[in-house]
């Protein structure tokens, strides 16, 4: 795409890249329980650099409770506060065919950061909108993949 100034000079825009700061705005779940979840009230942030990514999100439909004293909280109270919180960081690789494979290094859930663990998504970048659709992980293809719609924050 070229940008033409009033004096006739043209400048080339920066190449399209998934690198940046993103916010999930929607999750579309397929399969028997298909539905779309709006993320407008779900705090989240995904940061993608040249080789690494980091994501945090709250997967709850409303605000999480605030505990007066964490040391005195019951197991159910702790689950209500920390259960919906997701965090993960790792490396990623882009491949032909619009695929991105993510390999977690650190995560709230230790099961997703072991040796050989990965998840591959197809991705589509349309301006400042990034769509990620699950394809497969170390166990094989997803029977009912979900798709995430993210918008660029910066």
Region annotations inferred by a language model:
Residues 1-5:
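Bacterial N-terminal signal peptides
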């Amino acid at each position: 795409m070229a940008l033409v100034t009033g004096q006739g000079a043209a400048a080339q825009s920066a190449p399209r890249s998934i690198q940046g700061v993103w916010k999930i705005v929607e999750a579309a779940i397929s399969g028997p329980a298909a539905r779309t979840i709006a993320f407008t009230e779900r705090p989240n942030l995904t940061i993608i650099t040249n080789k690494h990514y980091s994501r945090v999100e709250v997967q709850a439909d409303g605000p999480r409770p605030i505990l007066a004293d964490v040391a005195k909280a019951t197991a159910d109270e702790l689950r209500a506060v920390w259960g919906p919180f997701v965090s993960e960081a790792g490396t990623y690789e882009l491949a032909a065919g619009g695929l991105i494979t993510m390999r977690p290094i650190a995560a709230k859930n230790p099961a997703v950061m072991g040796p050989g663990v990965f998840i591959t998504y197809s991705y589509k970048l349309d301006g400042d909108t990034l769509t990620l659709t699950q394809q497969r992980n170390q166990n094989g293809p997803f029977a009912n993949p979900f798709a995430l719609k993210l918008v660029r924050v910066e």
